[in-house]
Amino acid sequence: GIFSLVKGAAKLAGKGLAKEGGKFGLELIACKIAKQC
């Protein structure tokens, strides 16, 4: 459901932020949430 999606997004955000830096990680999460990849 919604909560598992949010948890997954948070995990991806954490990894993305750590690995790629803020902007890329946030854009990836926004893309996943909006389903407009």
UniProtKB/Swiss-Prot annotation:
Tissue-specific expression: Expressed by the skin glands.
GO CC, one annotated term: extracellular region
Pfam families xref list: Antimicrobial_2
GO terms for biological process, alphabetical: defense response to bacterium; killing of cells of another organism
Family annotation (InterPro entries): Antimicrobial_frog_2 (IPR012521)
Domain of life: Eukaryota
Keywords of this entry: Amphibian defense peptide, Antibiotic, Antimicrobial, Cytolysis, Disulfide bond, Hemolysis, Secreted
Signal peptide region: none
Predominant localisation class: secreted
Localization (cell): Secreted
Cystine residue pairs: C31-C37
UniProt record similarity statement: Belongs to the frog skin active peptide (FSAP) family. Esculentin subfamily.
General function of this protein: Shows antibacterial activity against representative Gram-negative and Gram-positive bacterial species, and hemolytic activity.
Name of protein: Esculentin-2B
Organism: Pelophylax lessonae (Pool frog)
